[in-house]
Amino acid sequence: MNIAEEPSDEVISSGPEDTDICSQQTSASAEAGDQSIKIERKTSTGLQLEQLANTNLLTIRIKWQLQEEEDDHCNSRITDQIMDTIQHYKGISVNNSDTETYEFLPDTRRLQVLEQNKDIYLYEHGSQEYEKSYKDNEEEDDWRYDTVLQAQFKYPKSLENACTDISELLKSEPIGQHIDKWSIGVNKHALTYPGNIFVGGIAKSLSIGELSFLFSKYGPILSMKLIYDKTKGEPNGYGFISYPLGSQASLCIKELNGRTVNGSTLFINYHVERKERERIHWDHVKENNNDDNFRCLFIGNLPYHNPEKVETLITPKEVIEVIKKELSKKFPDFDIISYYFPKRSNTRSSSSVSFNEEGSVESNKSSNNTNGNAQDEDMLKGYGFIKLINHEQALAAIETFNGFMWHGNRLVVNKAVQHKVYNNHNSHDRHPSISNHNDMEVLEFANNPMYDYNNYTYDRYYFNNNKNGNSNDTSNVRYFDSVRSTPVAEKMDLFYPQRESFSEGRGQRVPRFMGNKFDMYQYPSTSYSLPIPMSNQQESNLYVKHIPLSWTDEDLYDFYKSFGEIISVKVITVGGSKNKYRQQSNDSSSDNDLPVGSSRGYGFVSFESPLDAAKAILNTDGYQVSKDQVLSVSFAQKRGNLSSSDDDDQSQTDNSSKFQNFQPHNDYHKAYPTKYNKKFINALMTQNQSQQQVSRENYFIPLQYPNTNTKPVNSYNLISANQNNANWMMPMFPSFGFIPQVPPVPYIIPPQNPAANHIPIMANGSNEEEEFSSGDYSMDY
């Protein structure tokens, strides 16, 4: 196991996927004389932990009066009263074994320890002294606190109320007689489990034993989990490690983050569960979309080149320096918590920007080559986002830099508004934005049920509508989450099942309720039929062509929001996605023919419900939005299925060769290949089941059959029918890869025919077969 002795940069983010949102970093081995770099580390690197902070921590430290042993029950009674107050405000107590040893030190010494280790104990950067019972000049160094109680609160208001009540409790006369000293501390940017870390970049050659030896040097390991590929059985190169204390995890991050082990560079960071990261993210979004609290700013119309230096590109470092230079005059503590300035390459690997110890810019691509395509890829897109310490500084930045002339460009700076994620995952846009947005009349369509969901969707990418920082109006730029989809190679015609899908076969007849309840299964001649996505199409993601070039993401969202809950919307622009596949077959123009930031005339809309997506296609495909523009709407192609239909058929043939040893028992399965999107079919079946909660008695209609051996029966679970029971029959459906579950249907079983055919039915795509007799009879009720 080889470990390269290299200085490591401290990075605080939620994982490798977030490395393009960079904090200002400095090397741990920076020279002591460079005070500016030290100050930068103290503020930016520490404050970046706010992106992961997910709880509010309360710490109560108590030193008891010297008492007889029989009076110890009084101390326990006081402790119980404190814990009752914590529970009253829904606080969660922290296990005593998870309490850091420095919490028992006198306050002055404890603060000295934190100051000396400020570059290590990053999780303590939000700690503040709330109140204490003695003055600083009364403190002595030869004592320790006897009891330390810690609790976590979800809401800052609960923390504040608990602090007030506990402070009054400790000051009360009966309790004060038993306490010598006490102090209360708070941390509104704490981690729930500061001992948990994420480890990325693990070389596949490293064994569990080697990893355990490497990480156990910083403390006992409670647990270690490596993630493996389920199909290949190989490690994915990342995992999770838990230490008992946050100080041990912080020391590990300090020493190993950025080190090269067995040829692979480690990325180590505090770990917060995905659900917690999503909650933190949306808390920040709510704050930023509130005009009274926002701290995140959009900066547009940035110049591409520095005219004072020939062929020199503008870097994020230069933008940050200009902002700091101006605003530090008003705010001595001014700082930028995080920033994001995308490059024209629009790839995560090349858009990641960091600072080395000399302050120069480093990226995954060489910035020395300023010629040809390399220069274009390293060039910024002309816009970015920054997050400041507080709202007051954000307002000052807008006042100072909105309209500020820099290298011949007039900057556009305003509040970065993140759109609500859609229907109503969040109501983010409740307050008017500083930006000006054109309102578009919401179109009303038929068959547009609205659903009310309160779920959140994690939004990891920022986008804006105008990608050109040097032209056009950038005042209406917003950022949205991405629609991670792949364009279809050409327009896909909407597919409606043919009549043969439910034609009457030997010994069967289609149950009448199927045609009545499942609109999508009705014949094309009916007035209302839902389109069905194929297996190589996405069930909830729409590809919309021929949209007006003036439409933005918000306009496209407003157009479709009446159909149901929308997860994300994206209008594709020049200079945006570099996907080599184009949605339009006639889209052969190069980016040089169009201004950067202009719309390509197509986009994506991702719905939460597949049925809402189908209804949107039904209502808007062929819809005339203007005199010369008619929308063309279809299901988006799945990633990796961008070839023509012929190629797709060939790929399916190739895939099917894996199962060449499997031969269907009859021609029925050959006639109905699995080409429908299974998730869509499942959603359709689920909706039908919820609408048809019919009891057994409602369907059971006893009928007289000429033969006395005939028995009326009901089928309640078409999949789990008992093949040994001659009274069970299963209706035949097209092979969707599974047997759809439907409400109970009565059938009349005729006398058994010894010569009846046996038709195998594949249940849920498994290899287990269930055989059912199919005599010459018809089903009715």
Curated annotation (Swiss-Prot):
List keywords of the entry alphabetically.
Answer: Phosphoprotein, Repeat, RNA-binding
What Gene3D superfamilies would the database entry show? 3.30.70.330
Bias (Polar residues) occurs at: 365-374
Q: Name one GO biological process term.
A: negative regulation of G1/S transition of mitotic cell cycle
Enumerate the spans annotated as RRM domain. 195-273, 295-418, 540-638
Q: From the UniProt record, which GO molecular function terms apply?
A: mRNA binding
Q: Which residues carry this modification: Phosphoserine?
A: S29, S433, S435, S482, S485, S501
Highest taxon of the lineage: Eukaryota
> Where does the record place Low complexity bias?
347-364
Which segments cross the bilayer?
none
User: Any idea which residues bear Phosphothreonine here?
Assistant: T486
Q: Output the InterPro entries linked to this UniProt entry.
A: Nucleotide-bd_a/b_plait_sf (IPR012677), RBD_domain_sf (IPR035979), RRM_dom (IPR000504), SLIRP/GR-RBP-like (IPR052462)
Oligomeric state and interaction partners are given as:
Interacts with RBG1.
Q: What else is known?
A: Present with 1910 molecules/cell in log phase SD medium.
This chain belongs to the protein called Uncharacterized RNA-binding protein YGR250C
Q: Which organism is it from?
A: Saccharomyces cerevisiae (strain ATCC 204508 / S288c) (Baker's yeast)
- What are the top taxonomic ranks of the organism? Eukaryota, Fungi, Dikarya, Ascomycota, Saccharomycotina
